[in-house]
């Protein structure tokens, strides 16, 4: 009986590319510090899978996970409370928040979210649109099985 997980086995396959695409791939390997073309291609495939999963518009799919990074002026009146109110009113699950003081005026907050893609992206737009918010970036993820 094979005790190895199918998702753990490595399958070798070949890809045909034009020279200019191969050159670009090799440049990215060097620029980003990858040890091989395979490592870069695996990361690119994972990125595309996440992107495609988030593009699927299923309001009942609560499997999306994201991290919202927000930098804001903590002297902006009532901004903290408005950010909290938006989180509570949203259709997403706020799993965790982390708050740090960057300097005298700026705070950085990370908010880990779970829910459907529409609600998570709406929360990002609402918080990002508040007066005093200087930066609001959403990093998208989802949990998927390789061996389905």
Curated annotation (Swiss-Prot):
GO biological process terms, semicolon-separated:
response to nickel cation
Entry cofactors? Ni(2+)
Binding residues annotated for Ni(2+), in chain numbering: 88, 99, 101, 107
Does the record's keyword annotation contain Transcription regulation?
yes
Q: Which Pfam families does the record match to this protein?
A: NikR_C (PF08753), RHH_1 (PF01402)
Q: What is the UniProt remark on how the cofactor binds and its stoichiometry?
A: Binds 1 nickel ion per subunit.
Q: Which domain of life does this protein belong to?
A: Bacteria
Q: Keywords for this entry?
A: DNA-binding, Metal-binding, Nickel, Transcription, Transcription regulation
What Gene3D superfamilies does this protein map onto?
A: ACT-like. Chain A, domain 2, Met repressor-like
Q: Which InterPro entries does the protein's record reference?
A: Acetolactate_synth/TF_NikR_C, ACT-like_dom_sf, Arc_rbn_hlx_hlx, CopG, CopG/NikR_regulator, Ni_resp_reg_NikR, Ribbon_hlx_hlx, TF_NikR_Ni-bd_C
A molecular function (GO) held by this record is: DNA-binding transcription factor activity
What does it do?
A: Transcriptional regulator.
Similarity comment = Belongs to the transcriptional regulatory CopG/NikR family.
Q: What is this protein called?
A: Putative nickel-responsive regulator
């Amino acid at each position: 009986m094979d005790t190895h997980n199918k998702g753990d086995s490595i399958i070798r396959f070949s890809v045909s590319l034009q020279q200019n695409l191969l050159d670009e791939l090799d440049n990215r390997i060097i620029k980003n510090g990858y040890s091989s073309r395979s490592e870069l291609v695996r990361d690119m495939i994972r990125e595309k899978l996440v992107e495609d999963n988030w593009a699927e518009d299923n309001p009942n799919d609560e499997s999306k996970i994201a991290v919202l990074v927000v930098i804001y002026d903590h002297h902006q009146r009532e901004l903290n409370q408005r950010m909290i109110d938006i989180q509570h009113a949203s259709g997403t699950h706020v799993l965790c928040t982390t708050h740090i003081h960057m300097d005298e005026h700026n705070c950085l907050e990370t908010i880990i979210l779970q829910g459907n893609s529409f609600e998570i992206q709406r929360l990002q737009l609402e918080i990002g649109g508040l007066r005093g918010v200087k930066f609001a970036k959403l990093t998208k993820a989802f949990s998927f099985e390789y061996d389905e």
